[in-house]
Amino acid sequence: MFDIGWSELLVIGVVALVVVGPKDLPEMFRTLGRVTAKARNMAREFQRAMEAAADETGVKDVVKDVKNVTSPRSMGLDAMKQAADRFEKWDPMKPQQGAPKPAAPASSIPAAKAQQGAGAAAVTAPPASEPAAPVPQAPAAAAPEAASPAPAEPKSNA
């Protein structure tokens, strides 16, 4: 605390011996020890009182909250650092080991489940990504006419 070396202590002891005298020197050191002990006790008691007052006012809770708010994890800096590390290690020419397989279109999944649930083992519906070609339906009465060939259009010379 005071940063006093052995040489300084020896000088203080010699001066005290000359000034106080050999008869009263032990009593003076006892008194000095008691005063030092009382000063330490007072400092310890003051520190405990300050800590108790801080506990009552909630300073420790505020300090804990401030540390949590300013921590790198809560700010997302840890996640950013991990992402940057993964990006630095990433080789675009190397295929990914855990690459997900392309998923089936969402509209074809319910159609397949509906067919399984109905027990239909006949025709499966085409996926939604490929639209089905429209099939023209002719009325039953017009069916014989549709079978005859259509007249050829005359070519015009323009």
From Swiss-Prot:
Principal subcellular localization: membrane
Q: Where are the transmembrane segments?
A: 1-21
Q: Name one GO cellular component term.
A: TAT protein transport complex
| GO MF annotation list | protein transmembrane transporter activity
Q: How does it sit in the membrane?
A: Single-pass membrane protein
Q: Which GO terms describe its biological process?
A: protein transport by the Tat complex
- Note the superkingdom of the native organism: Bacteria
Keywords in alphabetical order: Cell inner membrane, Cell membrane, Membrane, Protein transport, Translocation, Transmembrane, Transmembrane helix, Transport
- Region of interest (Disordered), ranges: 73-158
Q: Which Pfam families match?
A: TatA_B_E (PF02416)
Where is this chain compositionally biased, Low complexity type?
94-132, 138-158
Q: Which InterPro entries match?
A: TatA/B/E (IPR003369), TatB (IPR018448)
Locations of Basic and acidic residues compositional bias?
Answer: 83-92
Tell me where in or outside the cell this protein is found. Answer: Cell inner membrane
Q: What does the subunit section of this Swiss-Prot or TrEMBL entry state?
A: The Tat system comprises two distinct complexes: a TatABC complex, containing multiple copies of TatA, TatB and TatC subunits, and a separate TatA complex, containing only TatA subunits. Substrates initially bind to the TatABC complex, which probably triggers association of the separate TatA complex to form the active translocon.
The record's similarity note reads: Belongs to the TatB family.
Summarize the protein's role. Part of the twin-arginine translocation (Tat) system that transports large folded proteins containing a characteristic twin-arginine motif in their signal peptide across membranes. Together with TatC, TatB is part of a receptor directly interacting with Tat signal peptides. TatB may form an oligomeric binding site that transiently accommodates folded Tat precursor proteins before their translocation.
Q: Can you say what this protein is called?
A: Sec-independent protein translocase protein TatB
UniProt organism field: Cereibacter sphaeroides (strain ATCC 17023 / DSM 158 / JCM 6121 / CCUG 31486 / LMG 2827 / NBRC 12203 / NCIMB 8253 / ATH 2.4.1.) (Rhodobacter sphaeroides)
